[in-house]
Amino acid sequence: MAEPEAHRSGVSSVGVMAVAHLTNDSYAYMLPALLPLLLGKLGIGIAAAGLLVTLYQASSSFTQPIFGHLSDGGKRTRWMAWSGVALSGLAAAALGLAPNIAAVAVALLAGGLGTALYHPVSAALVAGAVPQRSRGQWMSVYISAGNFGLPIGPFVLGVLVATIGLGGSWIIAIPALILAALVWRLGPSAVRRTTAPLSFRAVVAGNRRMIAGLVSVSATRAWASALVSTFLPLYAVSRGASVVDASRLLTLFLLSGAVGGLVGGWLADRLGRDRVIIVSLLSAAPFCFLLAAQDTLGPAFVVAAAVSGMLLNGSFVVLAVRGQESMPGSLGMVSGLMLGLSIGLGGLAVAPMALVAERAGMPPVFVAAGSLAVLCALLMRLVPRPPVGAFDRESRGLELA
């Protein structure tokens, strides 16, 4: 399918990408919502369910830098954005129709690859479409839209299953197909290189210290956030909350993170990227410690959940922009590192803390999350700063396709 030739740049096209991001990420949390139903329908055990979640996480996170590097290669790769969101929706719809565990695994693999296709190239397109002076603000709109989508998917799926049943899951693919068409028609123009692209190995070799620093900070932040989001509802239930109330608490954490992303991006354009990242992370630590100190689910616990979500996830947006400005000649690859690989690494690190929670209870997990936030802020001081004007110099080798 040939893409429209008209150039699409500027902030107007960011709206299309933001809504597509919201739609794409709304499918990410549908699997946890479907698991109880799939366990009964297909006779899947808990261990097998855990492997399925790992399959999705691995395919969606660890392949993003590779797809991002391919999108930096100078060819017309905008197709990755619209095909990625379409594949995510179709795969999520197939989960409810899958007749056996093998079909579920194939659907999850396809959904993970759809997410991996969409994220790095779309983030690079947005970064290239907006003025540098307001890049933090517009990237925060784009990324926060995805964060707003996370709690929407399970809610919509719950209503759909309660009304129609699993057989009606095909309906959830419709928004993805509509947004895929809009991205194809109205999304930002692809970026084409006028200089020869570097190989994956050359990019890594030339930015080894920068990549190590950015991934370390991003993965540590993702670990802290994943600890809170994973154990927050479990801790609430252990303290007498209903499953519904625990889910609401998780939704509050996620939505607060989306709001924090918008605020963080706006502040970063005015106060500086590193300053906002460090202050946000240091400020998040006391609220993580407050979660650990609460024996009841009173107002203090709810406030701590909301503020920790806002600060932990607010810094995520600014970290993504910092990465893009540190490696402007590899926007797709660095977006894959910051939005995919780092989150995947952080998620994998949750398993050891689950063992700690089984032996010592869940408060130490929240203490660990706060400590990781402090460590992350300290690591940020070690990340090399990009040379002044680096983005503008590298951009001379790029042009709209």
Residue spans for each PLM region:
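Residue-level signature of mid-helix packing/kink "hotspots" within the transmembrane helices
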Residues: 29, 57-65, 151, 254-262, ...
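Extracytoplasmic gate region of multi-pass secondary transporters
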Residues: 31-32, 211-251, 255-258
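Helix-breaking motifs and short loop linkers at transmembrane-helix boundaries and internal kinks
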Residues: 43, 75, 97-102, 272, ...
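Helix-to-loop junctions at the C-terminal end of transmembrane segments
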Residues: 63-76, 261-272, 357-358
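Structural signature of the two symmetry-related core transmembrane helices
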Residues: 79-93, 275-289
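Cytoplasmic helix-loop-helix junction between adjacent transmembrane helices
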Residues: 107-145
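Helix-loop-helix hairpin linking two adjacent transmembrane segments in secondary transporters
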Residues: 142-188
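A late C-terminal transmembrane helix in Major Facilitator Superfamily
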Residues: 329-359
